[in-house]
Amino acid sequence: MTITLGKRVLLTKEKIDKISYSLYLFVLVFAPPIVPYPHLFLTIFSFLMLVTTYKRKVWIVLKRSGIYNWVLAMGLLAMYTVCVPLPISMLCNDIVNTSHYISVINRYGVLIVAVSVCVTYLLCKTDRDGYGYEFLLESLINAGVIEGVCAALAFLFPGVKSIFIFFMKQFSASNLYSNTWYITVRSYGFASTLVDVFGLGAALIAGICFFYGITRKKIYMAESIVIAIATILNSRTGLLVYLISIVLSLLYVLQKGDIRKIISTFIAIGLLIIAGSKILDIMSTNEYTAGWFQAGIKSIQNFMSGNRTSNTSGDAMSMLFQDNFWKFPTFPRIIFGTGHSLYGAEGYAHSDVGYVNEIWLFGILGCLLLYGKIIEMCGMMKKSTRIPVFDYAAVFLLISYFFFNIKGAALGYNPGAVVMFFIIFVGTYQATSYE
């Protein structure tokens, strides 16, 4: 379908398709709560399309993309958890509140179902429509740009933020939108969650976008800045992930030795510094958000210089590295796991740290399977691909995942995990399709 005005072509079929793909990915990644659980509707729609329109293609896509093997690995991890850590916890009289187990099942179950179904559908549809990996990556970037614009509008116009907060409070499961401090200092954007995992997702898209800009299409270097606004306003950890992407991009082009791309990268970094300073100037107009951002910078500086404070409530790094946050199960349960984490488990001190929660949940044995599978998938993508952006993404995603897991659990249905697996499966599929 093409939309014209007289003899002038306004929108080609490809542009119309890119709009629809971009909106689809915006809902899949960020789950903007226009209605309750929008990702659920998306998953049901995608499943119905797979069993009707694409039923002959599904198995090929599942195998070539690596989705099938990932689902098997996660299923094996679930069986291990039910058969080993949980019975041991029953014998030790260490069964926690039922709501915690439900949240764990929801955390991993929704991620596996939504990502496997929706990414399979997108790959099937992309093949049928005759588009390649660039089309999907650019659609993902567009989804990030939409979120970046939403974040900027929410910061600049309080009325827009109030509308977003209304929907997020009504139709998302997070209680944070009833927290006066949180909605005053942060919560800029429109998504089911705007905490650190949101910042991780936005930073991953912005990082891929930056590299794509210096290696393929220059306009994406500018779009990278727009996407980064979402993480700057909501997640200091996400900003660090974005900085990692810039360093890795520079190292990548230096290693390849392409003078033109090296020059382009340094120019892009210079423009980023200028744009970043302007964004910080605008942020300073809101004393609460600016104060929160500056407190994070000061916390990192104090930590690096060894000046830890006993007042963890106002110091992010001191809170993160307090003893309670790094308490592991005793031997031998540290090996096998307990079947529950510390996040929301009654009778246990809370911890945000991803590694700590996952070792409590799965034990060292389960974590070897969990982390090993992620390393294997990224390694396979890097080994098999001939496309620079996926070669770069394999390293960037791995470093970002293991770095972020210090701050919080990266896995679960959230923007960070969805973006990571989307890129891995698209990258693996395009590589195996050319074999």
Predicted regions and their residues:
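Long extracytoplasmic/lumenal interhelical loops at the membrane interface
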Residues: I300-F362
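Generic alpha-helical secondary structure signal
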Residues: G130-E134, G291, D315, M319
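Hydrophobic transmembrane helix bundles of membrane-integrated enzymes that assemble
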Residues: T2-Y288, A349-E435
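Rossmann-like dinucleotide/flavin-binding elements
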Residues: W292-G296
